[in-house]
């Protein structure tokens, strides 16, 4: 199941760092990852998001609602703006805000199937067969979707 969240990508090459991209997710407290280049930063951000969402789901934690990307600002959402001990220095021309997508199912723990017997209305069974649905996958996706969008 694909999930998207906005992320802030700050670029700082002032100290010659091997990982000039610093990435944070404003909807998750203490979120941070980094990348060597834009592609690596995007990959690392997706991986961080997948691991974090899987942890939230598996531990029954409430999943935050994604912020609207249109309401975010690199300046206003700077995670260190109120930290007197740290000043985030970045190049505004190479920094950006982007949506990050992840398939949460790839990060969830045990994929071992558990047999369930259920009853559904005849019309749903008929329609499901007409659509060629995999009923187990449909139920699995619906459960994950309910948790993520609760």
What is each PLM-predicted segment?
Residues 39-51:
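A short, charged, amphipathic alpha-helix used as a generic interaction element across diverse proteins
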Residues 29-40, 117:
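A short, exposed loop/beta-hairpin motif centered on an aromatic-Gly-Thr core
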Residues 2-6, 50-119, 123-129, 137, ...:
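Short, charged, surface-exposed hinge/linker loops at domain edges
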Residues 26-29, 121:
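Short, proline-centered helix/strand-breaking motifs
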Residues 1-19, 24, 106-108:
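N-terminal segment of the canonical double-stranded RNA-binding domain
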